[in-house]
Amino acid sequence: MGARECPARLLLLSLLLLPLGLPVLGAPPRLICDSRVLERYILEAKEGENATMGCAESCSFSENITVPDTKVNFYAWKRMEVQQQAMEVWQGLALLSEAILQGQALLANSSQPSEALQLHVDKAVSGLRSLTSLLRALGAQKEAIPLPDASPSSATPLRTFAVDTLCKLFRNYSNFLRGKLTLYTGEACRRRDR
């Protein structure tokens, strides 16, 4: 293989692989509105939780990881401004992404990381990146920006707590997707249909 052929083949390979990322990166806003899409991510999170339920020592973290509180007061949620809902979901997703990445690093540094556990964590990292892109396409990031006339004191800080095991991290991930993310995307999709 000559020196000139190698860059040409790399370019060709890049062009062939480029479309693999396009369905998520250039995702239409309607994709997240298809309940099957969100259900797939919820199922992956639940599978991760189930896979980690049986392990004890190997699934404990050497330090606590901060995650978003997933409890939802439905009465208060329905009365929240769209921007506040978007902010809570966007901040929660960002914190959850950081938590999963931190869990991934702690798992990789553990004495004997299981390949199966590593696979579930890797799926969660990938899933959160995809969900972030889908929410961005839906406009959640723009909605999460506070209005100029909104007072800084009106924004409530994101409630958080700490987890110390991989199972609790996956449970939080699953609950966040089933709760706040599902509520927000459902309402955002209904607004888009109007």
From Swiss-Prot:
Function: Hormone involved in the regulation of erythrocyte proliferation and differentiation and the maintenance of a physiological level of circulating erythrocyte mass. Binds to EPOR leading to EPOR dimerization and JAK2 activation thereby activating specific downstream effectors, including STAT1 and STAT3.
Domain of life where this protein originates: Eukaryota
Family matches, as InterPro entries: 4_helix_cytokine-like_core, EPO/TPO_CS, EPO_TPO, Erythroptn
Glycosylation-annotated residues: 50, 64, 109, 172
Assigned GO CC terms: cell surface; extracellular space
Gene3D superfamilies listed in its UniProt record: 1.20.1250.10
Tissue: Produced by kidney or liver of adult mammals and by liver of fetal or neonatal mammals.
UniProt keyword list: Disulfide bond, Erythrocyte maturation, Glycoprotein, Hormone, Secreted, Signal
This protein's record includes keyword Protein biosynthesis: no
Listed GO MF terms: cytokine activity; erythropoietin receptor binding; hormone activity; protein kinase activator activity
Residues of the signal peptide: 1-26
Protein name: Erythropoietin
Record-stated family: Belongs to the EPO/TPO family.
Coiled coil regions, renumbered to chain: none
Gene symbol of the encoding locus: EPO
Cellular localization per UniProt: Secreted
